[in-house]
Amino acid sequence: MKGLSGSRSHHHGITCEAACDSLSHHSDHKPYLLSPVDHHPADHPYYTQRNSFQAECVGPFSDPLASSTFPRRHYTSQQELKDESALVPRTLATKANRLPTNLLDQFERQLPLSRDGYHTLQYKRTAVEHRSDSPGRIRHLVHSVQKLFTKSHSLEGPSKGSVNGGKASPDESQTLRYGKRSKSKERRSESKARSNASNASPTSPSWWSSDDNLDGDMCLYHTPSGVMTMGRCPDRSASQYFMEAYNTISEQAVKASRSNNDIKCSTCANLPVTLDAPLLKKSAWSSTLTVSRAREVYQKASVNMDQAMVKSEACQQERSCQYLQVPQDEWSGYTPRGKDDEIPCRRMRSGSYIKAMGDEDSGDSDTSPKPSPKVAARRESYLKATQPSLTELTTLKISNEHSPKLQIRSHSYLRAVSEVSINRSLDSLDPAGLLTSPKFRSRNESYMRAMSTISQVSEMEVNGQFESVCESVFSELESQAVEALDLPLPGCFRMRSHSYVRAIEKGCSQDDECVSLRSSSPPRTTTTVRTIQSSTGVIKLSSAVEVSSCITTYKKTPPPVPPRTTTKPFISITAQSSTESAQDAYMDGQGQRGDMISQSGLSNSTESLDSMKALTAAIEAANAQIHGPASQHMGSNAAAVTTTTTIATVTTEDRKKDFKKNRCLSIGIQVDDAEEPEKMAESKTSNKFQSVGVQVEEEKCFRRFTRSNSVTTAVQADLDFHDNLENSLESIEDNSCPGPMARQFSRDASTSTVSIQGSGNHYHACAADDDFDTDFDPSILPPPDPWIDSITEDPLEAVQRSVCHRDGHWFLKLLQAERDRMEGWCKLMEREERENNLPEDILGKIRTAVGSAQLLMAQKFYQFRELCEENLNPNAHPRPTSQDLAGFWDMLQLSIENISMKFDELHQLKANNWKQMDPLDKKERRAPPPVPKKPAKGPAPLIRERSLESSQRQEARKRLMAAKRAASVRQNSATESAESIEIYIPEAQTRL
């Protein structure tokens, strides 16, 4: 009798009628055709032991609300009372069992609409159901249901599905079919007739009736079902469903139930039930039934235990729990809104362990009364798999001290996972293999959810998972229904897309070992790259389950001293993505990362290799292998990736020492965040939620970038060279204003945001060998310092300075550094002009230099600032690229050099105590004969100065041409570079 409906779920009590011996008096009753005028007086033998409710229970039978049959439920205006006992005469049930189906239909059609007499067990559904069970009670109910389900099916297994444990006689095959609620025409027509009769009165609350309590031999033995609720009491939701069964129990009922192996119900007999009784809590119950006795009751052949009690108990949960989303037509045999369509008698069959076998063709069909041999074999293997759990559960005493978490621990989550080889042979059972195998995402998670959700629901108050448990316990082979309820649990069983894990293992399997070796600098902490699976299941019925899934790197932010790099890797990760990548691109909070480390080998149900995963994996691998991710800390927010870059104030000597030994290539995924130059020396986390893209973030910004043709925005990579760094650091040491100059070398993490658009994008982060002289980063060098005589620049330095491929942030910082330097010069010269009594020619030079600098800052610097802001504005049209900014900056350098030369001359004059020329030099100039040489006296130094200035300009032009050549060579050789990180992301990556 697997077909008990949901509304019948509220009676689990031991039969409380004292007149158990009076059953023989009514064995001669015709079970269906009693007179409608039988008013069931108070001295009726079935109602001899009523309580104080009895006077209110009896009502006129013309009233449809009161015209229920035995056992009935009466509803008063003050409080709705439940007057049910599951006691049905065994002889009467046996007679009803043997009646043919067509005769049952005739009996039902002959009945009036008042449906009086002993026709069937009728239960009234309230119009507005108050579903107020607490989650703790729900967990308790679910745990009870799970154990009943496990035991009943373990008894079914050896007898090939017979509910009577091997005693299924030919007589009872019809009962078996009825218990299964098969899709036969008789049952459907009968249910339809019942539905039409039940819903004839639209004003009254809907009635439903079922003959299933009269179907089998076990109707007398509904009592174990009430006992094996394991100490539950009908608390809050049962305020309108007080059970007479508990307060009218007598010694005879206890004796009758002790024939079922001494089930003790002492506390049930003392339970006070009155109209004003307070709601009973679980602490008021102390059932002395142990699970071992429950198993004996189940295994006793006279009990004839089958699925009806599992159904009756679990359907109470379905009735009282408002979270169940399973359609009522699938659960109960009635239509709640009185529609005339056919009542679906098919249940969601309770063999979800067959679902767990992953068998698509599912050898057990609804219409077949006997399961196939395949299903029988599966049930036997299921019995083997679950027997250790049952054995351990026999020692567990269920009382008010045991919480559901404690009760379920004995067949724990791991055992449920490891014993789920139901459609596979037991010898091939390997829990690790099951967990890591992509084939594991078959239907065996249905059973595993049934075993594991109960243990996990106490940790997670996700009421939707209760729905998954009920579906798993009571559904048989409903592929569509189970798939609709296919909720991913934190166990993360599905292993569909592990290619990113394999790619990481192939591409950077050495990283975790090599990082600690390469990070050999004493200040650095050991940096490890971990792949962390974060998942939060958003439970949505009959829709796609959204699961946040990502790979983040979990590491500490180290000091900025770069480690020593021995080799440069070639990392190429090609990630074929599925179309589900949009919902995976979000990351969970950082709080989950610590406890999710244990699941790092698992993936979610909607796991796919989207761009975030592949790019993060490859880029973090590159970080770890090239220099360790010294400059960034990958965090995760709800919709963005944040990067913390540590820019510490390191002395120039330390930098010079480190940069001579190292080349630091750091690539990261980050978001836009503008940082002021004053804060460049401190760690700062960028928290703006903008479009997340792939781009290269350089630790000390001694790099250069390249852009692939297929990428819409620049994906940048850097190179730095120690010889070039030496020169730049020497110039910094000799610089008179080392503060803003040193600031140019400390680049923060806020590089531009690069969106991933289109499919088939290639991102190249390229590096070159040391002998590739044309690939130098120009922006690492300070602006030209012609006022310092000790600096002599070679063409390579010119190339390095000229080529610049930065974004707007970087050029704004350079521009600010130049402005600060020039303003410092202007203030210095103006102060010298005020403090010293200088000759007019020197004053003229000072005013010329200061005016030129101010004009340059007011005009060209302002124009360049606007260009940088347009570059940072994604809506600007036309939007200057980084290469445009680099070219404009190179032209700006020429003007900066001219002004620098003027200030250099002023510095020389100041060093000479503001004296114009050395007298010795003047004497040498006057040495030629006076008459022919007089016209050339004055302009001679001027001509020499102009020639020097023109030579400087020619050198600057040469540097600019060399820079352009280097840029073209670098772009052509980007893909043929000696070291590259290539990430190929095809398909479905346009939704970031």
Curated annotation (Swiss-Prot):
Taxonomic superkingdom: Eukaryota
One GO biological process term: chemical synaptic transmission
Annotated stretches, region: Disordered: 150-209, 355-376, 914-980
InterPro entries named in the record: SAPAP
Family, similarity comment: Belongs to the SAPAP family.
Protein role: Part of the postsynaptic scaffold in neuronal cells.
Protein name as it appears in the record: Disks large-associated protein 1
